Amino acid sequence: MRRPPEAHYSFTIPSIHDDTTLDCRIYHPDTLAKPKDLADLAQWRRKGIVMAHPYAPMGGSYDDRVVGIVVEEFLHAGWMVGTFNFRGAHGSKGRTSWSGRPELDDYTSFAAFFMHYISCLRPRITSDLTFVPDQSPILSNQSESAPVQDDASPMVILGGYSYGSLILRHLPPVPTILQPFSAPIAGTAADEIVLRARKLADQSNLEWINLARDETRARRKSRAGNEPRPPVTMGGEETSPEKRRSSRDVRRSLEGGSRLEIRTRLRSLSHRRRHESHEPIPQPEKKSATTTMPDVRYLLISPLTPPTSTLAAPALIHKFWSRSKDDCQEVIGKHITLAIYGDQDIFASSKKIRDRSEQLKAEPNSRFTSVEVAGAGHFWHENGVEVRLRSALKEWETAIR
């Protein structure tokens, strides 16, 4: 039995839905985790994949076997991989919802974290980097933790298996995902997510700066710094407790401020005192956070179809595998997408997936592809099907890299 890959970072972030703590992992490929020299780092293109797990009440978590297969294949191919637990999965905080909407925000939270993290990485060590102990590596004439100015945007795959693919299919376009994180209110979950992404990116950048410094000093001789460092586990929060604000508090504050402003204006009109000035209502502090827009792709493994999908997330009634069109379907259809499924899946209709896949492929400028694996069930335990799953992932990765 293979030994599972070791996460480079294990940490938590709050969900933008209600601040529920989400357990997360980031895996670095060997090119980043154990580079032989600076040339390894310089050749790496920023590319990563987020993979969501199956239904938590049925044992789904980021330790799922099929999720692990995706982690292994993409790590081996040089991709960074991010996984997370939906609320209530594998002992995580909270509980699985009946609607699916909180889980949609859970995915959005981690996807935004992942995109900010990969945008802030600077694996290409250059001579204008300044190293200061106990501080982040800083580029000359560039602010700390700014996104990398690279020749190409990061490539990010948003993926999901089973229930994870159901949530994935309801995600809005990437610009919409990132919008709440562009100027987050200080102390909110969105602000906390951006801060954690930057802090972990700073830590990775510092590792590479140390490697560059060691290589310069040792002139490519053997050094202890080339040994793999132990994984980092990080909990807690980046914001101090007195400044941390829950998502509910922020919504209540903003709604209350709006109601107060309306009442003030009505009172002013009724007493004909328009000439009097009112003190402005203090607004929560906002921070600017920019990130590089990634080149996004989608990966769906064993996607659910009705009635299973309706039972798992009734509030996300979605007819992706039908003939009707909606915004979610358009998001998937307009990007490079792979759907892999088995023809013996007890939780999905292979005929529905097959028919709709052919329709999507036939549309103008379609970038949708699908692979149907004969004899494969939902859990990919049947004889020989894991090999075919891995093969399909390898072929697709080679085609899109």
Describe each PLM feature range:
Residues 59-69, 350-351:
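The serine-hydrolase catalytic nucleophile loop
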Residues 69-93:
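Conserved alpha/beta-hydrolase
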Residues 38-56:
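Short beta-strand element of the alpha/beta-hydrolase
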Residues 96-148, 175-220, 230-238, 243-245, ...:
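Alpha/beta-hydrolase active-site loop
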Residues 1-44:
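N-terminal cap/lid segment of alpha/beta-hydrolase-fold proteins
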Residues 333, 338-341, 345:
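Short beta-strand/loop motif that positions the catalytic acidic residue
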Residues 58, 94, 376-389:
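Catalytic histidine-centered segment of alpha/beta-hydrolase-like enzymes
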